[in-house]
Amino acid sequence: MTCYIALRIESVGYSYYQKLSEKTSGEVKSLFVKLATQEREHAAVFRKMLKDADNSLIAKDWEDNVGYLKSYAEISIFPRTESIDVPDNINKAISSAVEVEKDSIIFYSDLSSFIPDCKELKDIIEEERRHLHDLVKLYGSI
């Protein structure tokens, strides 16, 4: 269930960054192309996790807590991403991306507590943190 939510998060992120890259140029465009590519790679990791699901990695209280993660995504992440329209104002677009990245980090960090030995998930969390850092740096330079 939560890997499907993660797939949705990454797919929407890919589309958002792809659209931003089409509206920008130079270094800003390069960053958005890089972020889009990495979001697509994250989606591939989650697809593989779904395919290779190892139930022994999943904590016993998984079913009780999956509802919390789903609710978190529905309340915090998806309302921002449902409208995939990219704002014309680049600062608003970056600000929106920052919020989604922050919420994604929280979601994946909580997910990792139920799948504690998943290196792929930990790697994605670190990459999402780098996305956040890059976006904040970009916001400060505009």
Over which residues does each language-model region extend?
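Non-heme di-metal
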Residues: 1-142
